[in-house]
């Protein structure tokens, strides 16, 4: 069994001639061949980026403290600023009219839905050949699965988490209520993705891929709502997110288990070494576990609790209606009896008036 590898943050794997090969300009692991697979979407992206910006994604390198947004102080500053701006923005908008921003919000959500779909396809295109050639465990645990194209795509997903912070500012400007879950989730996710890139966890592609698929659905839902379209499957968006966290935790716990068993030399009880820094694994477990709890509470309060309250209100209304109907029937009965008594008195008066002699005789007797 090989020893656990030392982490080299500046190691890059390159893509050459349709195979995954090691870049000789960097130290690190050996190459891994997946055959002559074609990567049409990746090739298209390189051509587009080259024509537009004069740079190709295939030349990207992620180096801690050198690449933009790759240092911990910068990340911390952005997240702290995000929370401070929420507080300041709320105070500024307190006595102001809400800003609608309806069209901008529509395009924003549609753009994120489409971008998430494209990024998910790009990641799948890179991972599928490795799974086909070497198996699923290789793709989530082997250090050779940490390739240059995937690093670039992870970095794109990472940057998108900072862009998604603008969700909150839309809500502030529109004077919509902000929930703790929303603000916490946005800030924590940016930090989480940062820890995974720095920690070089090979399982990252799976967690990010699932998240992107959720975002395709979620942002499309928000797009429809922003257009004023009534969407009946809102509840399923939250359910999809909860399923995502269960899946994430299942895969991460498996990876952590097999790595711990490997380090303890219980080789028969594990599938081998799982690459990545232990701190990154801990951050993943802690953060996603907190998401799962918060989303389940949100789901219960929003759907289950509200549904129970609606049922209770409906039952109370029905009981009140039945009580009102019973009271109405009782009133009708009393009125009917009263009318009958009045009719009887009138009838007696008529008889007395028609037969006064008879009445007098009766009185004399």
UniProtKB/Swiss-Prot annotation:
Residues 90-111, 171-179, 226-241, 300-365 are cytoplasmic. Its EC number is 2.3.1.199. Belongs to the ELO family. Keywords: Endoplasmic reticulum, Fatty acid biosynthesis, Fatty acid metabolism, Glycoprotein, Lipid biosynthesis, Lipid metabolism, Membrane, Transferase, Transmembrane, Transmembrane helix. May be involved in the synthesis of very long chain fatty acids. Glycans are attached at residues 17, 65. The keyword Mitochondrion does not apply. Signal peptide: none annotated. It holds the Pfam family ELO. Residues 1-68, 133-149, 199-204, 263-278 are lumenal. This is Putative fatty acid elongase 2. GO terms for cellular component: cytosol; endoplasmic reticulum membrane; nuclear membrane; nucleus. It is found in: Endoplasmic reticulum membrane. It catalyses: a very-long-chain acyl-CoA + malonyl-CoA + H(+) = a very-long-chain 3-oxoacyl-CoA + CO2 + CoA. It is an enzyme of class 2 (transferase). Disulfide bonds: none annotated. One of its GO terms (biological process) is fatty acid elongation, saturated fatty acid. It is a multi-pass membrane protein. One of its GO terms (molecular function) is fatty acid elongase activity. The lineage of its organism: Eukaryota, Fungi, Dikarya, Ascomycota, Taphrinomycotina. The chain crosses the membrane at residues 69-89, 112-132, 150-170, 180-198, 205-225, 242-262, 279-299.
């Amino acid at each position: 069994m090989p020893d656990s590898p030392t982490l080299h943050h500046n190691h890059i794997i390159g893509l050459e001639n349709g195979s995954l090969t090691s870049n000789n300009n960097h130290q690190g692991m050996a190459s891994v061949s997946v055959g002559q697979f074609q990567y049409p979407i990746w090739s298209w992206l390189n051509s587009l980026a080259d024509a537009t910006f004069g740079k190709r994604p295939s030349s990207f390198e992620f180096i801690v403290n050198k690449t933009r947004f790759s240092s911990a102080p910068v990340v911390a500053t952005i997240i702290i600023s995000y929370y401070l701006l929420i507080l300041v923005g709320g105070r500024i908008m307190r006595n102001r009219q809400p800003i609608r921003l309806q069209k901008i919000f529509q395009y924003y959500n549609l753009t994120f839905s489409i971008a998430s779909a494209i990024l998910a396809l790009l990641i799948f295109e890179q991972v599928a050949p490795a799974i086909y050639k070497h198996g699923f465990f290789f793709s989530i645990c082997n250090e050779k699965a940490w390739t240059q194209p995937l690093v670039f795509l992870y970095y794109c997903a990472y940057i998108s988490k900072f862009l998604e912070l603008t969700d909150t500012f839309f809500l502030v400007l529109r004077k919509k209520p902000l929930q703790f879950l929303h603000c916490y989730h946005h800030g924590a996710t940016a930090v989480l993705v940062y820890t995974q890139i720095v920690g070089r966890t090979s399982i990252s592609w799976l967690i990010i891929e699932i998240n992107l698929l959720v975002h395709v659905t979620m942002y499309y839902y928000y797009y429809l709502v922003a257009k004023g379209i009534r969407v009946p499957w809102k509840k399923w968006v939250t359910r999809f997110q909860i399923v995502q966290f269960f899946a994430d935790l299942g895969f991460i716990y498996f990876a952590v288990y097999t790595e711990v068993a490997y380090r303890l030399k219980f080789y028969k009880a594990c599938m081998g070494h799982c690459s990545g820094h232990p701190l990154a694994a801990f951050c993943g477990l802690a953060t996603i576990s907190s998401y799962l709890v918060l989303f389940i509470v949100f789901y219960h309060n929003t759907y289950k609790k509200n549904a129970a309250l609606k049922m209770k209100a409906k039952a109370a209304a029905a009981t009140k209606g039945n009580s009102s109907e019973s009271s109405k029937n009782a009133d009708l009965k009393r009125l009917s009896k009263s009318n009958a008594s009045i009719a009887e008195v009138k009838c007696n008066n008529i008889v007395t008036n028609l037969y006064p002699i008879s009445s007098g005789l009766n009185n004399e007797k």
